A protein has these predicted regions:
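Ankyrin-repeat boundary/"N-cap" motif
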Residues: 8-18, 41-54, 76-85, 108-117, ...
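A surface-exposed partner-binding patch
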Residues: 11-12, 211-314
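Ankyrin repeat A-helix N-terminal signature
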Residues: 18-24, 54-61, 85-91, 117-124, ...
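Ankyrin repeat structural motif
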Residues: 24-33, 60-70, 90-100, 123-133, ...
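The conserved C-terminal loop/turn that links adjacent ankyrin repeats
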Residues: 35-39, 72-74, 102-106, 135-138, ...
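A generic tandem-repeat structural signature
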Residues: 56-124
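Solenoidal tandem-repeat scaffolds enriched in leucines and small polar residues
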Residues: 98-166, 174
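Elongated, non-catalytic scaffold/linker segments and compositionally distinctive motifs
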Residues: 146-241
């Protein structure tokens, strides 16, 4: 069996692949003389193919990398730029070589991954400082990778980003986090209180909301993590938890008095045995979450909706009705008036 790292393990591969990963330059010269095209991808298994340069970089074989570059291999392939492969799989000698010969340090691959993310995927943490020192700086480019690293619980990696000036409140949308969370929101939703405290100690803002209005405190309430919720509550402005201030905030929503009274009751959890939802739990009035769907204002009323994690019960002031909001597809369905 032939192990090519995370490209896979193969019972057999073309002989040229062995020559590439072992740096057999004489064999590569001979193959070139016999008409081998160094730009043509090599088939591995039924469904995968890789360029010779990709194979050399993945296997950290500097002699083959050098030989291929000298013979015209493309260092800045749009789908798999050499710099990303080097920082994910290789050592500093290979990284320095491809950069010295024209590799774009700011390149993104076909799925918008940058160098910091590539190094994290490959667990080549020692390459993070190299990337930064080459000019792909943490301050300008590190936010996305930093946010992605939160769920790995690797504090040494997080320290690297923070000490090099990462935007600790980075919240641009991407394919992983389209709902625009900050790293602190990610920590509140997917990690633990220790991580939240770590981020706050390094300047994370507890008041920044996600696209749907959720802030770290709201996320903790949703998760029923009252220790975390109390922690965030002590850090938030006092007016966030003042009833009169909340009522002023909710005036544009024109809530029916009956709905206000309902949300102030003690029991906000209901079993729904004859419904697909199974159960529903509403948020207390002070914890309801205003947000916008496009230009339309909505107020989230539900804490959880049975097994439907992507659905929320909302109040729509435009229709003056209760609605159901599908967060995954960003669709709003009108249900009924509150008293119905």
């Amino acid at each position: 069996m032939i192990d090519l790292k995370d490209l896979g393990t193969f019972e057999s591969v073309p002989e040229i692949v062995i020559d590439i990963v072992k740096g057999n330059i004489l064999a590569l010269e001979s193959a070139l003389a016999d008409g081998w095209d160094i730009h043509k991808p090599i088939q591995l298994g039924k469904y995968s193919e890789y360029s010779p340069l990709e194979l050399a970089l993945v296997m950290n074989c500097l002699p083959s990398v050098q030989w291929l570059v000298e013979h015209g291999a493309d260092l800045n392939d749009e789908e798999n730029p050499s710099f990303l492969l080097a920082v994910r799989y290789a050592d500093q000698k290979v990284i320095d070589y491809v950069v010295d010969h024209g590799a774009n340090i700011h390149a993104l691959n076909s799925v918008e991954v940058d160098a910091f993310q590539a190094a994290l995927y490959g667990k080549k943490y020692e390459n993070l400082q190299i990337i930064h020192d080459l000019g792909h700086t943490v301050q300008k480019y590190g936010g996305k990778a930093f946010r992605n690293a939160i769920t790995e619980n690797n504090y040494e990696v997080l320290d690297f980003f923070i000490h090099n000036g990462v935007d600790i409140n980075y919240n641009k949308p991407d394919s992983v986090y389209p709902f625009k969370p900050t790293p602190l929101c990610v920590a509140a939703r997917y990690v633990d209180l220790q991580m939240c405290k770590y981020l706050v100690e390094h300047g994370a803002d507890v008041t920044i909301t996600e696209k749907d209005g959720m802030r770290p405190y709201s996320i903790a309430i949703e998760r029923c993590d009252m220790e975390m919720a109390e922690y965030f509550k002590t850090l938030e402005p006092t007016e966030y938890h003042d009833k009169q201030n909340k009522m002023d905030q909710l005036k544009p929503f024109k809530l029916p008095k009956a709905l206000v009274s309902f949300l102030e009751e003690d029991n906000l959890y209901f079993e729904l045995p004859d419904s697909d939802f199974i159960s529903i739990e509403f948020l207390p009035l002070l914890d309801t979450v205003p947000f916008k769907l496009g230009r339309r204002k909505l107020l989230r009323l539900s804490k959880e909706l049975g097994e439907y994690n992507d659905w929320q019960i909302v109040w729509d002031p435009k229709s003056k009705k209760i609605g159901c909001y599908d967060t995954e597809h960003q669709e709003l369905r009108e249900l009924c008036k509150f008293d119905e």
